[in-house]
Amino acid sequence: LLKVLFLENDSLEYIPFISNDPVFPTIEYGMDTKQINDKNQKLIEENKALFFDLVKQKKLSLTVHNESGTLMQQVIEESRFADMMLVKSSMSLSYEDDQNPTSFVKQVLAKAECPVLIMPEDSQTINEIYFTYNGSHSSVFAIKHFSYLFPAFKYLPVTVLYVSEEKNDQEDKQINDIRELLYAQYKHVTVKVLQGTAEAELFSELALKKNVIVTFGAFGRSTISRFFRKSSTNSILQTIDIPAFITHP
């Protein structure tokens, strides 16, 4: 069952107003509630019509919820009863939020009670799977949940990116364990051991990839959260243009 949330943001935008003073013209910002509401309502109705046309073409079964008020709370409550949530990395409740991922998306990642699939702007066919793995409970948790949700992907090639940031006596065992788990579900599995910092190594591996999907084991609860912080190379989600499956125990 596909469930769709239409979220209506109650916050207002600032609109520029130019003064009529011919000598000292100024620009001030104010709120034109009627203009904003009319513009937003028209856009909402147009997007809904496009969406329902697509659903009809694809012959999908779905339920629709129209949500307003405390939107984050509504989203999290809905996630409790969902197998997975799809969110665009650019989704925002504020016209000023130009981060990628946005503040809204970061909150969803940290608070959602189901896996979240962060979608790039343009859809793409998935031809390969990348699992990030460091032996932790959260990384295995993400891999297992992804496999449960996408059984049709079992014939796609899988690459496990194992990042070894420091000497680890359990490395061989951890690699053998993940191989054993994945060989039972996938036909083509490769484990690639990366040496160095997780951010740099994963960025190097994923930066130029297309038509792939990647899993991360946590957000805000382990070193995985570092990938989404601003840095000299920007956040990994801003730089890589591929779907990212993110969840935490």
Report the location of each language-model feature.
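A short acidic, glycine-rich active-site loop
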Residues: I27-L43
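A short, acidic, amphipathic alpha-helical segment used as a generic capping/interface helix at domain edges
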Residues: R179, G196-L208
